[in-house]
Amino acid sequence: MALSGVYDLFNDKWCNQTVWIFSDTHFGDTDIKKVCPNRPSDEELVKNINSKVGRKDTLILLGDIGDIEYAKQLRGYKVLIAGNHDAGMSNYSDVFKEVYSGALIIGEKLILSHEPVEIPWMFNIHGHDHAGAKRKNHLNVCADAIGYFPINLNQYLKTGILSKVESIHRLTIDKATERKNKRMKKR
């Protein structure tokens, strides 16, 4: 399942497959407890993830994985969008079926990334922000922001969240209308 495969997960033919999304496991990082003192152990984090993700499910991790040995224990078809702490980790392709070094755009309104991305006509699912700051048209799936369990992406998208995002076409028309109205007022 290549890039088109990840995109296909969101089409009707994949509706029986569950897609989970999560970020910032930081496996093996002893300093993370200084930032997030209530964080569970690496072993507990693996258990939390595997308690949700089945062997036939897809798990999309949005970066900052850490120790690859823990990632090997995770279930499912694993996809990685690398984060800022994943630089130089060449062995990720041994564990993940798909590895992306940058953001992944899915359809016209959804972008998956490690760090938050501000694109007015897209909904951004990201990690990186351990404090869990709220942003319009964003979902932060950083482990520390969502209670250390992955989110069922299928169920989340079924809430209609993408329908609340204005399309680039609507934004373009609105901007053009606004400019026209300003010109008319000046006359």
Give residue ranges: language-model regions.
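N-terminal active-site segment of His-dependent metallophosphoesterases
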Residues: 1-70, 159, 170-183
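Hydrophobic "anchor" residues on beta-strands that sit immediately upstream
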Residues: 20, 60, 79, 123-124
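Long, low-complexity, intrinsically disordered segments
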Residues: 185-187
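A general structural motif
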Residues: 16, 56, 75-77, 121
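Conserved beta-sheet core of the metallophosphoesterase superfamily
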Residues: 87-178
